[in-house]
Amino acid sequence: MKAVIILGLVLLSVTVQGKIFERCELARTLKRLGLDGYRGISLANWVCLAKWESDYNTQATNYNPGDQSTDYGIFQINSHYWCNNGKTPGAVNACHISCNALLQDNIADAVTCAKRVVSDPQGIRAWVAWRNHCQNRDVSQYVQGCGV
């Protein structure tokens, strides 16, 4: 009985951590999922975006108190416009997806939603981190040495 209690406490203390991609691993994955050149956006720009939005972490979340929305996953996709978390007032859910799907180690759903985001007129400029850290910069370093 004591062993069961100890095992239970150990399991409760384990924290959930999503996949944190290595830079080149992410570049290869994004290429395989069709982001290289999608809507004219280079693979290097996508990797730069993921670096500055989530530090390549699939479990990253960020709450925005102003509109009570949350950004989810490797691309920090917002619950007000793009996904449904069941909590954000007036959510649109333009990607027709649960926000939890954007936190998976398999980033196929996140990529599909990111493609939807950049299909809007604002394109990749929808991401503040991309505008602040990647736009009009040499982003080739983000895929350098990755063989992509």
UniProtKB/Swiss-Prot annotation:
Location(s) in or outside the cell: Secreted
EC number: 3.2.1.17
Name assigned to this protein: Lysozyme C
Subunit structure: Monomer.
Name of the coding gene: LYZ
Domain of life (superkingdom): Eukaryota
Organism: Papio anubis (Olive baboon)
Biological role stated in the UniProt entry: Lysozymes have primarily a bacteriolytic function; those in tissues and body fluids are associated with the monocyte-macrophage system and enhance the activity of immunoagents.
Lineage: Eukaryota, Metazoa, Chordata, Craniata, Vertebrata
Keywords of this entry: Antimicrobial, Bacteriolytic enzyme, Disulfide bond, Glycosidase, Hydrolase, Secreted, Signal
Family as reported in the entry's similarity comment: Belongs to the glycosyl hydrolase 22 family.
Active site residues of this protein: E53, D71
Other notes: Lysozyme C is capable of both hydrolysis and transglycosylation; it also shows a slight esterase activity. It acts rapidly on both peptide-substituted and unsubstituted peptidoglycan, and slowly on chitin oligosaccharides.
Predominant location: secreted
GO cellular component: extracellular region
